[in-house]
């Protein structure tokens, strides 16, 4: 009993340490996670060199796979940004008369969010919400909240987004399967947490015009944007290649030439690599961008990923320390005695960590470290489902600790209480619906 108390206390104190150092002391999450790693190692009796070796292997093992995918994904997202491909998707959906404006914003967020970091997606796509709001005299809240909820949902549950890819990789989940489940769950969660929730409010949702300081932000002219076909082909190509790999694994015998080829092109690194050169041509060279210009855009894109790479690397170190110290195995036994369903536990841990730390990425990595050790005790629950459950939890509770909360507040010209009342509630409802959809999927498949 005493050893169990020690294990639980060590884990809880390490989580509190992460939260306090990030929120109160303003540490970068990279430093906070490394500090927590050393703390756990020391508390569990690991030697100094043993701790350092575990941290090195954790960072190297995590980034060895993810660094290339994140780097390639950044290039793809940058090409979407500079070419106007994301705006093309939005303008095309606007022409669908049978789609309401709020549903259009959800679909724009889901499709464009596949290749864009969530904050970048908000900054890039919010002019579309401004444009629609001005044309239709609609409250900006009714458009911006569905957009941001959809972007957050994709960020949390759909690889190749870094956090979703990290979770799938650590749990040993099939990435193609996680993509399919994630898109389905993300769509349901975004539609209910965004449009349906806001429509249910009716006249209680205040009218918010486009703030004066953003009045000059406009969507580019349609004639300057790439075609819809080129845009969708570029966005969906890496997803399609990864899904082909999954289909091959389910339906073909291993070892054949075709199987090997499909495994190769469907590997996330290869799929993203192919997609980058397709994007260079379809969204760049074909539109009179020279290789010098593309190089500049690539370098500019790489400047933004050091932050996420370091955080994910430190998350890998924290996971490695939990395993090497023996805390993970002890924790698995303790959690199995709680009689809480692993899907609910995964969701709840990610939800609480996101609210506490303010980073969905850090929350998902922390939840993975806590939940992963107990998976062997539940062979009936697939790692793909647990990956979606963790992402579903991270969608919710976007509060003042999260930079996205402040982005929404600023762009919508909303007060603090209004942002809490409408946006935070929307993300929590989306998270609950994602949890329900995940449970439903676990019963069906």
Please place each PLM-identified region on the residue numbering.
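Long, contiguous bundles of hydrophobic transmembrane helices that form the permeation core
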Residues: 2-5, 180-296
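Hydrophobic alpha-helical transmembrane segments
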Residues: 8-13, 31-34, 67, 102-107, ...
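Membrane-embedded alpha-helical segments and adjacent helix-loop junctions characteristic
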Residues: 48-135, 288-375
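Hydrophobic mid-bilayer segments of alpha-helices in multi-pass membrane transport proteins
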Residues: 7-19, 26-46, 67-72, 230-243, ...
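Structural signature of hydrophobic alpha-helical transmembrane segments
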Residues: 2-11, 62-71, 117-121, 184-187, ...
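Alpha-helical transmembrane segments of multi-pass membrane proteins
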Residues: 99-114, 137-156, 174-187, 342-354, ...
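C-terminal transmembrane helix pair
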Residues: 186, 342-445
């Amino acid at each position: 009993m005493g050893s169990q108390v020690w294990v639980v206390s060590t884990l809880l104190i390490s989580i509190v340490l992460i939260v306090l150092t990030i929120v109160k002391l303003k540490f970068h999450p990279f430093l906070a996670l490394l500090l927590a790693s050393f703390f756990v190692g020391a508390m569990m009796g690991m030697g100094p060199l043993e701790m350092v070796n575990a941290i090195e292997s954790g960072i190297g093992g995590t980034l060895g796979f993810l660094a290339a995918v994140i780097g390639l994904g950044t290039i793809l997202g940058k090409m979407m940004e500079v070419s106007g491909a994301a705006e093309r998707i939005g303008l095309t959906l606007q022409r669908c008369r049978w789609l309401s404006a709020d549903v259009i914003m959800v679909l724009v967020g889901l499709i464009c969010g596949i290749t864009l970091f969530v904050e970048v997606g908000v900054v890039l796509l919010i002019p579309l919400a401004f444009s629609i709001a001005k044309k239709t005299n609609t409250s900006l809240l009714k458009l911006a909240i569905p957009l941001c909820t959809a972007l957050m949902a994709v960020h949390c549950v759909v690889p190749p987004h870094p956090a979703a890819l990290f979770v799938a990789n650590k749990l040993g989940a099939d990435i193609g399967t996680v993509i399919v489940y994630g898109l389905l769950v993300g769509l349901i969660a975004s539609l209910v947490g965004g449009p349906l929730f806001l429509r249910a409010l009716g006249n209680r949702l205040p009218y918010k015009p486009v703030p004066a300081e953003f009045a000059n932000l406009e969507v580019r002219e349609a004639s300057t944007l790439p075609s819809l076909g080129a845009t969708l082909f570029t966005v969906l190509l890496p997803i399609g290649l990864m899904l082909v790999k999954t289909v091959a694994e389910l339906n073909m015998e291993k070892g054949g030439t075709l199987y090997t080829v499909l495994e190769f092109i469907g590997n996330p690194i290869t799929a993203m690599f192919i997609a980058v050169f397709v994007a260079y041509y379809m969204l760049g060279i074909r539109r009179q961008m020279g290789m010098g210009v593309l190089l500049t855009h690539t370098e500019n894109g790489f400047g933004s990923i050091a932050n996420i790479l370091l955080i994910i690397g430190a998350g890998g170190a924290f996971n490695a320390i939990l395993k090497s110290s023996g805390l993970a195995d002890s924790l698995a036994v303790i959690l199995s005695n709680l009689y809480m369903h692993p899907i609910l536990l995964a969701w709840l841990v990610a939800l609480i960590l996101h609210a506490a730390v303010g980073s969905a990425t850090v929350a998902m990595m922390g939840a993975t470290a806590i939940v992963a050790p107990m998976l062997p005790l539940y062979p009936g629950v697939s790692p793909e489902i647990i990956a979606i459950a963790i992402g579903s939890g991270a969608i919710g509770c976007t509060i003042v600790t999260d930079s996205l909360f402040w982005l929404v507040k600023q762009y919508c010209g909303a007060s603090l209480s209004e942002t809490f009342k409408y946006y935070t509630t929307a993300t929590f409802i989306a998270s609950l619906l994602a949890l329900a959809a995940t449970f439903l999927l676990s019963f069906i498949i």
